[in-house]
UniProtKB/Swiss-Prot annotation:
Protein name (Swiss-Prot/TrEMBL): RNA polymerase sigma factor SigI6
Database matches in InterPro entries: EF_Hand_1_Ca_BS (IPR018247), RNA_pol_sigma-I (IPR014244), RNA_pol_sigma_r2 (IPR013325)
Family from the record: Belongs to the sigma-70 factor family. SigI subfamily.
Species in which this protein is naturally found: Acetivibrio thermocellus (strain ATCC 27405 / DSM 1237 / JCM 9322 / NBRC 103400 / NCIMB 10682 / NRRL B-4536 / VPI 7372)
GO term, biological process aspect, one: DNA-templated transcription initiation
Gene: sigI6
Length: 253
C-alpha cells in the first residue's frame, strides 16, 4: 500500500489514521511496529534522497540514505500531533534538514550569492559552468540545478528573479522583519500548505501572528513568498543568506 500518494480526502484521512496508529504503537515501545513502519516508508525516504541528490542511490551503499533513515527515525521520535498536523510533511522537513547539514559538512567553501547575481541567470549559469573545473565541477552543476529548481518554484507564483531584485528591501531591519514573517509561514504546516495551494499569502493569519500592518504584507508579498519557499526547500545556497542575515550584515540585493 502506497501511503504517500495523492488521493481523495477520505484516502488521506484514512492514511493519516493508520500512520498515527503506528506512531502510537512505536512510542509505546513496539520495536516491530517501528521496523514495519520504516520498511513501508522506504520508497518515501528514497524519493527524498533522490530529490536532494538528483540521483538514484542504493540504500546499502549510500551515506545519504543512512542520513535520511536516521532523520526519519528522529522524526518518528519527535513527532507531536498537536504541533504538526501531517507526519509526512514533518518527516520530510527533518530529512531535508539533515541532508542539507550533511551536504554542508562535505562541501567546503560553499559560496553565497545575492538575488542580484541571478538577474540574468541564464547567462551567468553558462559562465558558471564554463568556469567550473576539477573538484568544483560537480558542486557548480548542483548549484545550477538549485537555481533552476527555485526559478521553477517561483514561476508557479508568477515571481521572477528580476522581481526579487526589485522588491528586496534596501535596509537590513526591513529584511529582518520580512524574513521573520516568512519564518512564521515556513514553520507552520497549515499556513505553508495554504500558501502552496492558493498561491497567495495567508494574510489574515499573518496579521494576527506577525502583528504587522496589512500594507506591509501586501507591499512585500513577493519577497515573503520567496523566503518562505526557501526555508522549506532544499535550496541551501539561498538558505545560507536567508538564515544568515540575522547573524551578520548581508546585502541581499
Amino acid at each position: 500500500m502506497d501511503w504517500h500518494f495523492q488521493g481523495t480526502n477520505d484516502d488521506r484521512e484514512h492514511t493519516k489514521r493508520i500512520i498515527i496508529e503506528y506512531l502510537n504503537r512505536i512510542k509505546a515501545g513496539d520495536d516491530s511496529a517501528r521496523e514495519e513502519f520504516i520498511l513501508r516508508f522506504r520508497p518515501f525516504i528514497l524519493k527524498l534522497v533522490y530529490k536532494a541528490t538528483d540521483r538514484h542511490v542504493e540504500p546499502e551503499n549510500s551515506e545519504e540514505y543512512s542520513v535520511a533513515l536516521l532523520a526519519f527515525n528522529e522524526a518518528i521520535n519527535a513527532y507531536d500531533e498537536e504541533k504538526h498536523s501531517n507526519f509526512l510533511v514533518f518527516s520530510e522537513q527533518v530529512i531535508n534538514r539533515r541532508l542539507i547539514d550533511y551536504k554542508r559538512k562535505n562541501h567546503k567553501n560553499k559560496m553565497v550569492y545575492p538575488f542580484s547575481y541571478f538577474e540574468n541567470e541564464d547567462i551567468k549559469l553558462e559562465r558558471t559552468l564554463s568556469d567550473a573545473d576539477g573538484n568544483n565541477a560537480i558542486e557548480r552543476l548542483e548549484f545550477t540545478d538549485e537555481i533552476r529548481l527555485f526559478k521553477s518554484e517561483l514561476a508557479s507564483f508568477d515571481i521572477t528573479f528580476k522581481d526579487l531584485l526589485s522588491c528586496t528591501p534596501k535596509h537590513r531591519d526591513s529584511r529582518e522583519l520580512l524574513i521573520n514573517i516568512a519564518k512564521k509561514i515556513a514553520s507552520n504546516d497549515g499556513l505553508y500548505e495554504k500558501l502552496k495551494k492558493t498561491k497567495k499569502l495567508p494574510t489574515l493569519e499573518l496579521l494576527k501572528l506577525a502583528k504587522v500592518s496589512r500594507r506591509t504584507i501586501e507591499r512585500n508579498k513577493k519577497y515573503i513568498i520567496a523566503v518562505s519557499l526557501i526555508l522549506r526547500s532544499n535550496l541551501e545556497i539561498f538558505k545560507e543568506y536567508a538564515a544568515g542575515i540575522q547573524e551578520k550584515e548581508v546585502d541581499l540585493r
